From Swiss-Prot:
NCBIfam families: alaS
Cofactor(s) this protein requires: Zn(2+)
Protein name, per record: Alanine--tRNA ligase
Chemical reaction(s) catalysed: tRNA(Ala) + L-alanine + ATP = L-alanyl-tRNA(Ala) + AMP + diphosphate
GO molecular function: alanine-tRNA ligase activity; aminoacyl-tRNA deacylase activity; ATP binding; tRNA binding; zinc ion binding
Pfam families given in the database record: DHHA1 (PF02272), tRNA-synt_2c (PF01411), tRNA_SAD (PF07973)
Gene: alaS
Native organism taxonomy: Bacteria, Pseudomonadati, Pseudomonadota, Betaproteobacteria, Neisseriales
InterPro entries linked to this entry: aa-tRNA-synth_II/BPL/LPL (IPR045864), Ala-tRNA-lgiase_IIc (IPR002318), Ala-tRNA-ligase_IIc_anticod-bd (IPR018162), Ala-tRNA-synth_IIc_core (IPR018165), Ala-tRNA-synth_IIc_N (IPR018164), Ala-tRNA_ligase (IPR050058), Ala_tRNA_ligase_euk/bac (IPR023033), DHHA1_dom (IPR003156)
Function, in words: Catalyzes the attachment of alanine to tRNA(Ala) in a two-step reaction: alanine is first activated by ATP to form Ala-AMP and then transferred to the acceptor end of tRNA(Ala). Also edits incorrectly charged Ser-tRNA(Ala) and Gly-tRNA(Ala) via its editing domain.
Residues the entry annotates as binding Zn(2+): 562, 566, 664, 668
Length: 874
């Protein structure tokens, strides 16, 4: 049975049992700061289990994409070296939200595994474990399923505390928890290992294939186990493990999906295909996690999820290097993965080009430092120490881009221990430097437990309100006096709180002579807005009746830029391709800054086309309408949504005629014509695969255009051109003339250098076996090299060291006639001189260059060369 067939069978089985098939959630969890990546099927249902969310179904089944990698201590280093470790895997699951419980969960699992209609696994190949105190589950296995008692294993509290057991699941220190029952498959007595709970349980004979978690209790802060009113079920079955069972193989890497990927890896690296080669397995595993992460919006970076992705990519590239492939190859495997898994996960097909570009860019970036870093590491390992120094590990990490676990991987192959403590010291020193250099924005999270704020700002710019709370220095106070900086919470507010990339509104809150200047608006809680600013006159007290008024000019500018951003987003997708996704935005009164996923620079022609499309929509002057509707209705409108974002049951849909439909909670113009004019003023890369575009609107765009016009007129006047069309020709002619003069100057310098060099050789010091020239001249580094090469070519026994000082920096060049390189080496000579002037360098035995920073020591260094060379000639 192929892996793809097994996936479909599982979902079909549970669909026949009344379960709703729910598509896999993104690998990037939303609204769950406790998770780096989705790592289990239940992640997307966490709020349902906790009672915070309700679904229109009580039974669900999924094939969930999962990634388990992240943090220095993880299983990444084991991937490729064991039969079942992966960075990416699929978790098949069935879930009950207060519907069925233990009996049905166990019966469903048993039927799917053993029924001839489904998997038809021999019953005597299976074993079940239960929590020691879970008599209910034990009796279901024994009396209803008919499993022999010797193949039902009770597992107690084997982790040192009450309820701390392999067979007792807990979401956290408090909250839903309960016993679980695991199903194991026997790979055969020829494989070493014992049943769960035995001394040999870590062997590979008995492998867990399914875990059924019974959420039965709610653990309170005192540790009491209180029965849940509606117990639930969460199960998980690893697809790759189950495929190995169904295909009668022992290792996950032997299943059909991996066999095809392994052959592709061998093809692209030029390595011989062998199931004994860990590097092939590493790369085959890593192309899955990397491709799926990029498809779900993660891009390589130096922090968070992006850094985990970077680590995985670089580990794969290093293993390719180990197999002898030094050119970019990893991205070429994406097509093979799409062929294997694209039907089950259409996002792979949709994002194939983007995935390939992101991987190729990261490969190329790492290739620039991989060889140099490997040379440094090999040199350190060649010293024979059994432990790699922490400073070297840090240098590899900081300078050459070697993640810690990549270095650990290499050292593991050589049985070399890592100086982890030394590495941590270097890392902490770097973090301390970063903390000292960084300033932080004040935190808007203030203590508040009063009523929510009602936002009136979509339709009103001014409200009559009541002061609910006041803050000064982060603490609640009863009043703010003149000169006090703080925050105000009012019951009705026209001020938009920073959200969705749009900055918070500014304006005033006042009553009579009492005036508070609002300089920013932030959310203190989800539905509580804080107006931050300063009391410019009088006094403000809790309970005061006040007028809150938004600054119209700034609000209007914010609205123009925000509405223009929507039009630009749509135009970018139409012009550049459907792969374009929003990666970030900042809407202010001055401009809009928009970050998008795109593998290369946006061309001038593409920018012009985007501008044309946006301004066409502006000139159409269509109405901008907002409507609150259900998510289902919003999807029917074709509204653009942020990929992977989590939305509520009701959403706000913003429509601009036929030009743009998008979910948005921001403030916008009434008609597109209010934008006035749209102009992109900059475009550039901010990370691998991410471009940043900045644009302006309205009078700001007009002002920019007028400044450009003035600049062009100044250039026309300066170049004495007759018209704008003549300017370019004038500039090109001037540049050509300057280039010709530079060539003429270079020829003159070269001639002078040759003449100067001849005189230097005439004045050389005779050391018997050699003629020594050690002098400072006026020349650049290129001229120094040319002179030294010329002099050594004219003599069969010359030792030359020439120096020059340009902009306070020392340039050195040494040359030795080939007949003398057995005794005197140019690389050694230039290194000797460079170290004394605060620099370093080296090169070939006959020619070498270096630099330095201490020009004051140069005369003494040149004087010392005679003794140094003389000693070498003895």
């Amino acid at each position: 049975m192929k892996t793809s067939e097994l996936r479909q069978k599982f979902l079909k089985f549970f669909e026949t049992k009344g379960h709703t098939v729910v598509r896999s959630s993104s690998l990037v969890p939303h609204d769950d700061p406790t998770l780096l990546f989705t790592n289990a099927g239940m992640n997307q249902f966490k709020d349902v289990f906790l009672g915070f969310d309700k679904r229109p179904y009580s039974r669900a089944t999924t094939a969930q994409k999962c990634v388990r990698a992240g943090g220095k201590h993880n299983d990444l280093e084991n991937v490729g070296y064991t039969a079942r470790h992966h960075t990416f895997f699929e978790m098949m699951g069935n879930f009950s939200f207060g519907d069925y419980f233990k009996r049905d969960a166990i019966h469903f699992a048993w039927e799917f595994l053993t029924s001839p209609e489904w998997l038809n696994i021999p019953k005597d190949k299976l074993l079940a474990t239960v929590y020691a105190e879970d008599d209910e589950a034990y009796n279901i296995w024994l009396n209803e399923i008919g499993m022999p008692s010797e193949r039902i294993v009770r597992i107690g509290d084997n982790k040192g505390a009450k309820y701390a057991s392999d067979n007792f699941w807990q979401m956290g220190d408090t909250g839903p928890c309960g016993p679980c029952s695991e199903i194991f498959y026997d790979h055969g007595e020829e494989i070493w290992g014992g049943i769960p709970g035995s001394p040999e349980e870590d062997g590979d004979r008995w492998i867990e294939i399914w875990n059924c978690v019974f959420m039965q209790f709610n653990r309170d802060e005192q540790g009491n186990m209180n029965p849940l009113p509606k117990p639930s079920v969460d199960t998980g079955m690893g697809l790759e493990r189950m495929a190995a069972v169904m295909q009668h193989v022992h290792s996950n890497y032997e299943i059909d999906l991996f066999q095809d990927l392994l052959k592709a890896v061998a093809r692209e690296t030029g390595a011989a295909f062998s199931m004994e080669e860990p590097s092939l397995k590493v790369i085959a595993d890593h192309i899955r996690s990397c491709s799926f992460l990029i498809a779900d919006g993660v891009l390589p970076s130096n922090e968070g999820r992006g850094y985990v992705l970077r680590r995985i990519i670089r580990r794969a590239v290093r293993h390719g290097y180990k197999l002898g492939q030094s050119k970019p190859f990893f991205h070429k495997l994406v097509a093979d993965l799409v062929k294997e898994m694209g039907d089950a996960y259409p996002e792979l097909k949709e994002k194939q080009v983007q995935i390939e570009e992101a991987l190729k860019n990261e490969e190329s970036r790492f290739a620039q430092t991989l060889e140099t870093g490997m040379a440094l590491l090999e040199n350190a390992l060649a010293k024979g120490s059994k432990k790699l120094d922490g400073e070297i590990i840090f240098k590899l990490y900081d300078t050459y881009g070697f993640p810690y676990d990549l270095t650990a991987d290499i050292c593991r192959e050589r049985n070399i221990e890592l100086d982890e403590a030394g590495f941590e010291r270097e890392m902490e020193a770097q973090r301390a430097r970063a903390r000292a250099a960084q300033s932080f924005k004040a935190n808007a999270q203030l203590p508040y437990d009063g009523q929510d704020t009602e936002f009136k700002g979509y339709s009103e710019r001014q409200t009559e309100s009541k002061v609910l709370a006041l803050y000064k220095d982060g603490e609640q106070v009863d009043e703010l006096n003149e000169g006090d900086s703080g925050a105000v919470v009012i019951d009705f507010t026209p001020f938009y709180a920073e959200s969705g990339g749009q900055v918070g509104d500014v304006g005033y809150i006042f009553s009579g002579e009492n005036r508070f200047e609002v300089r920013d608006t932030q959310k203190i809680k989800a539905a509580v807005f804080g107006q931050f600013g300063v009391q410019t006159s009088g006094r403000l007290k809790v309970g005061d009746s006040v007028t809150a008024k938004v600054d119209d000019e700034i609000r209007n500018a914010n609205m123009r830029n925000h509405s223009a951003t929507h039009l630009m987003h749509k135009a970018l997708r139409d012009v550049l391709g459907r792969h374009v996704e929003q990666k970030g935005s900042l809407v202010t009164a001055e401009s809009t800054r928009f970050d998008i996923s795109h593998p290369q620079a946006v061309t001038a022609e593409e920018i012009a086309e985007v501008e044309r499309r946006v301004n066409e929509a502006v000139l159409a002057n269509v109405a901008v309408n907002a409507a609150i509707m259900s998510m289902e209705d919003a999807q029917k409108t074709g509204a653009m949504m942020l990929f992977g974002e989590k939305y509520g049951d009701e959403v706000r849909v913003l429509q601009m005629g036929g030009f743009s439909t998008e979910l948005c909670g921001g403030t916008h113009v009434s008609r597109t014509g209010d934008i006035g004019l749209f102009k992109i003023i900059s475009e550039g890369g901010i990370a691998a695969g991410v471009r940043r575009i900045e644009a302006i609107t309205g009078l700001n765009a007009l002002k920019w255009a007028q400044e450009q016009e003035r600049l062009v007129k100044d250039i026309i006047a300066e170049t004495k051109a007759q018209t704008e069309k003549d300017v370019l020709a004038k500039i090109q002619a001037g540049a050509a003339h300057a280039k010709a003069l530079e060539k003429e100057l270079a020829r003159a310098k070269a001639e002078l250098a040759v003449h100067a060099g001849a005189k230097l050789l005439d004045d050389a010091k005779d050391l018997g076996a050699a003629k020594l020239v050690a002098a400072q001249i006026e020349a650049d580094a290129a001229a120094l090299r040319e002179i030294v090469t010329d002099l050594t070519g004219k003599s069969d026994n010359a030792v030359i060291l020439l120096a020059a000082v340009n902009d306070g920096k020392v340039s050195l060049c040494a040359g030795v006639s080939k007949a003398l390189t057995g005794k005197v080496k140019a690389g050694d000579l230039v290194k000797f001189a460079a170290e004394q002037v605060g620099g370093k360098g080296g090169g070939r035995p006959d020619l070498a260059q270096a630099g330095g920073t201490d020009a004051g020591k140069l005369p003494a260094v040149l004087d010392s060369v005679k003794d140094w060379v003389g000693a070498k000639l003895v």
